[in-house]
């Protein structure tokens, strides 16, 4: 053990002699900005606000007797009646599905806003919204909310293969 210690001390002394006259290098590390993270935060905030804007169209305070005849059928104006007819016959297949089971009205409104924002971003024009049976609260509210949104072209009760009276098929206007 003595030999090992003596070798270590000798090698340490030799190393110090060899490095005699050298000086420490100046730190030349380049620190990169966090621009990528900042851009990600800005994008996520922008997407959040876009989704929130879409959910602000849905109001609880408008007249609720708007759908007296048929609460599961709506067309924005008469130019789109052919779209509604095709939707009733099941000619359109949904590009995206939204399940609102177990959500309260506030959460459902937020999810509807997110759905419309995603559909417009991804250029999907047909959506399927499953509200289920339950206490029929969402079943009564969803057509009312959708009719208030300016980007909804038409909606109708889903065909039997897509959930029948527990779901709604929606046609969304895509902005280019």
From Swiss-Prot:
Keyword flag Hydrolase: yes
Top EC class, one word: hydrolase
Entry EC number(s): 3.1.-.-
Top-rank taxon: Bacteria
GO BP terms: rescue of stalled ribosome
Domain annotation Smr: ranges: 98-173
Family according to the record: Belongs to the SmrB family.
HAMAP family: SmrB
NCBIfam families assigned: PRK04946.1
Quaternary structure annotation from Swiss-Prot or TrEMBL: Associates with collided ribosomes, but not with correctly translating polysomes.
Family annotation (PANTHER family): DNA ENDONUCLEASE SMRA-RELATED, UPF0115 PROTEIN YFCN
Function: Acts as a ribosome collision sensor. Detects stalled/collided disomes (pairs of ribosomes where the leading ribosome is stalled and a second ribosome has collided with it) and endonucleolytically cleaves mRNA at the 5' boundary of the stalled ribosome. Stalled/collided disomes form a new interface (primarily via the 30S subunits) that binds SmrB. Cleaved mRNA becomes available for tmRNA ligation, leading to ribosomal subunit dissociation and rescue of stalled ribosomes.
Name used for this protein in its record: Ribosome rescue factor SmrB
Record organism: Buchnera aphidicola subsp. Schizaphis graminum (strain Sg)
């Amino acid at each position: 053990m003595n030999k090992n210690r003596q070798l270590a001390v000798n090698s340490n002394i030799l190393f110090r002699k060899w490095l005699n006259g050298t000086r420490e290098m100046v730190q030349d590390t380049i620190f990169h900005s966090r621009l990528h993270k900042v851009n990600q935060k800005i994008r996520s905030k922008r997407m959040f606000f876009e989704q929130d804007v879409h959910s602000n169209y849905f109001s609880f305070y408008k007249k609720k007797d708007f759908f007296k005849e048929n609460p599961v059928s709506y067309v924005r104006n008469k130019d789109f009646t052919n779209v509604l007819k095709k939707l009733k016959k099941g000619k359109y297949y949904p590009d995206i599905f939204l399940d609102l089971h177990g959500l309260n009205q506030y959460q459902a409104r937020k999810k509807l806003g997110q759905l419309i924002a995603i559909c417009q971003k991804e250029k999907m024009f047909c959506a399927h919204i499953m509200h289920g049976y339950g206490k029929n609260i969402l079943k009564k509210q969803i057509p009312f909310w959708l009719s208030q949104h300016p980007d909804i072209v038409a909606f109708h009760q889903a065909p039997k293969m897509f959930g029948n009276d527990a779901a709604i098929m929606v046609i969304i206007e895509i902005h280019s």
